[in-house]
């Protein structure tokens, strides 16, 4: 009887702790479920930011057509990635760029918008464009887990485990 009381108390504790995590997740997913279901009725005006730059000669030499990497998808050279970070406040380190004969293209998807960087390999002209679709789009993308990164993936996993713990402890408490 003492052992049963111990397990019942432990189950109650796990149940209320997991319910707190579930409550946070359910609030977010409930609201974004409604916004996703009515996406066509929620007007959004994307904000687009565009910048044009010219690569310095020493960096242009890193991307000329005769300096292609062995694969058509490869990261930008480190010095070029550092320059992009300094000039545009955009971290492209480790991201694969599409290397064609004419240009380099780096896709930069993110929740609630997207961005891209294009560098003309002949002239060294660089174009950067960032689109922000607003906070509702941001939350909707979190709901779908689109372009959200490792931290959000971990949150989704923790939320799923908390839901399982909540459900299972609830069933055992009923027993």
Segments (PLM) and residue ranges:
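Internal alpha-helical transmembrane segments
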Residues: 1-48, 153-175
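Charge-dense, low-complexity intrinsically disordered segments
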Residues: 8, 70-71, 129
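Membrane-proximal low-complexity regions enriched in glycine and acidic/polar residues
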Residues: 41-105
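Extended, hydrophilic extramembrane loops/domains of integral membrane proteins
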Residues: 108-163
């Amino acid at each position: 009887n003492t052992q049963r009381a111990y397990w019942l108390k432990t189950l109650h504790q796990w149940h209320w702790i997991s319910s707190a995590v579930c409550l946070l997740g359910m609030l977010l997913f409930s609201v974004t479920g409604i916004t996703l279901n009515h996406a066509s009725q929620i007007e959004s005006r994307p904000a687009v930011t565009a910048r044009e730059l010219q690569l310095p000669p020493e960096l242009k030499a890193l991307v000329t057509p005769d300096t292609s990497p062995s694969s058509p998808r490869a990261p930008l050279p480190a010095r070029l990635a550092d320059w992009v970070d300094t000039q545009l406040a955009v971290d492209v380190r480790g991201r694969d760029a599409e290397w064609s004969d004419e240009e380099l293209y780096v896709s930069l998807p993110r929740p609630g918008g997207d961005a891209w960087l294009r560098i003309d390999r002949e002239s060294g002209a660089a174009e950067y464009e960032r689109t922000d679709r607003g906070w509702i789009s941001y939350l909707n993308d979190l709901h779908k887990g689109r372009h959200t990164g490792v931290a959000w993936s971990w949150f989704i996993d923790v939320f799923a485990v908390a839901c399982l713990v909540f459900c299972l402890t609830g069933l055992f408490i009923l027993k």
